[in-house]
Every structure is written in C-alpha cells, then in structure tokens.
A protein has these predicted regions:
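Alpha-helical subdomain
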Residues: 2-141
Length: 141
C-alpha cells in the first residue's frame, strides 16, 4: 500500500537500515520486484481464501527465482490444531471469525500454511516461534 511506505521508510531510517532495504508498493497479485534476498508477508494470507493465498505465494516464488537463496517469511497468527479454552486460543478464534465474516479469509495452523506453501511450489524450512500467537514461517524454493 502506498500510504505505508512513508512511515516504514522513517522507521527503517531511524534504525540505520536505509541502505539495506528497498520499500516498494504495489499489489501482490501483480508481478513482484524480482531478485530480492528476502520477501515478507505479514498478516496478508489470513485475509484470503486458499486459492488467493496460493496465487500470492506463486507471485512470491516467481520473484524469488531470480535470486538463488532468496527466502520468504510469512508472519501470521498460527491457529492450534485443536482449540482449547485459553486466552490465546480464544483470541485466534475471534480473529478467525472476523477474517471469515469481513474478508472471506481465515486463521490457519502451521500445517495448513505449510500445505499452501507446498501448493505454490515453496518449501517451508522452519517456524521461528514468537512470544505471541504469531509465528514466522520461513520458505525457500
């Protein structure tokens, strides 16, 4: 989104990383800039149904082909395989319902995200656990 570039650029500059990052706005349904070391999707896939998720991931894969060793990081809430009556699971369930009603998407488990990545011909290599309901799935070609 174009309006997200300015605050992101300011934060990157504050961290002294401007020479290491390029921020590009656009649609992930169109061709993505090719040849980057890293591609990042945060809270994107849960907005969409499986077919749209695979299209987005295929666009990432297409862009990654230009750079051997390129990685994709997918940051999303990771739903449990079986929900329990915990505050964490309840928060994920509420978000899941919100995604379904408002956007037609849903929260998914790590297994479900790995399946979407595989369908897009990407291989999930690891899950970087975060101290929250979010996880960071790392994927390669």
């Amino acid at each position: 989104l174009p309006h997200a570039i300015e605050p992101a650029a300011a934060q990157i500059a504050r961290l002294g990383l401007s020479s290491r990052c390029e921020l590009v706005s656009g649609s992930f349904f169109d061709n993505l800039p090719a040849g980057a070391d890293v591609y990042l999707l945060k809270s994107v896939l849960h907005d969409w149904d499986d077919a749209h998720c695979v299209r987005i991931l295929q666009r990432c894969r297409q862009a990654m082909l230009e750079r051997p060793g390129a990685r994709l990081f997918v940051i999303e809430r990771l739903a449990p395989e079986h929900f329990a009556a915990t505050p964490r699971d309840r928060a994920i369930a509420r978000s899941d319902l919100n995604m379904l009603v408002s956007l037609g998407g849903r929260e998914r488990s790590e297994r479900e995200y790995r399946a979407l990545l595989a369908e897009a011909a990407l291989r999930a290599t690891r899950n970087h656990a975060l101290p929250s309901e979010y996880g960071v799935l790392e994927a390669v070609l």
